[in-house]
Curated annotation (Swiss-Prot):
The keyword Flavoprotein applies. This is Flavodoxin A. Residues 3-17 form the Flavodoxin-like domain. Low-potential electron donor to a number of redox enzymes. Transmembrane segments: none annotated. The keyword Transmembrane does not apply. It comes from Azotobacter chroococcum mcd 1.
Length: 17
């Protein structure tokens, strides 16, 4: 992480890059 673009499914965020 870090802080940046959210990634994961459209229903919920998995984490941040």
């Amino acid at each position: 992480x870090x802080i940046g673009i959210f990634y994961g499914s459209s229903s919920g965020v998995t984490g941040k890059v």
